[in-house]
Amino acid sequence: NLYSLKNLATLYFRYPELGKPKELAFEIWEKAWHAGVWSAANFLGYNYQEEEWLDLPKAIEWLEKGMLYCELYSAYELALIYLYNDDYKNVERGLMCLERCVEGDYIEGIEGLANVYFNGDLVEEDMSRAKQLLEKALELGSGNAAYRLGWMYERGFLSEEPDYVKAM
């Protein structure tokens, strides 16, 4: 089973008591990717963002590959780099990555895009769009979205006055 390659690499990476060097995990994840286990790109992209292995160009390369094969975690991680890392900032590409997350019902990405529209730092503030996205995340089971919607109603972001009934 090709997916066992990815799992084996993950075990080697997480459990040093197995006696395998962490570098071997990267090699095995790459083999898994080339064998068609697209989710291996998630592990590579994520771990190349970690301090010990920090290599953002490699992280971006793997996350782009993952997103190409519809890995929504890759799209989300890529969006964070493009939106918030000054050295790699590409707001248009970052928003496209988050829109992919919305299309694929990836809650963290939906909430992330809602936050972008709520804050208005990267795009024009749009409370209506933020609300729409949070409602979608709520429908998918996000407790965080429920809290944020309630908070927005409580503080009057979604109505002229605070709406304590809707906040509950």
Which residue ranges define each predicted feature?
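Low-complexity/repetitive intrinsically disordered segments
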Residues: N1-S4, K166-M168
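Eukaryotic tandem repeat interaction scaffolds
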Residues: Y73, E92, E103, I107-D121, ...
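Hydrophobic face of amphipathic alpha-helices that form TPR/SEL1-like repeat modules
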Residues: A9-R14, A41-E50, A75-Y84, I110-N119, ...
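Short helix-capping/linker turns of helical repeat alpha-solenoids
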Residues: N1-L2, R14-P16, A35-W38, E50-E51, ...
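Structural signature of tandem alpha-helical TPR/SEL1-like repeats
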Residues: E17-I28, E52-W62, D86-C97, E124-L133, ...
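Ankyrin-repeat and related helical/solenoid repeat scaffolds used for protein-protein interactions
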Residues: E139-M168
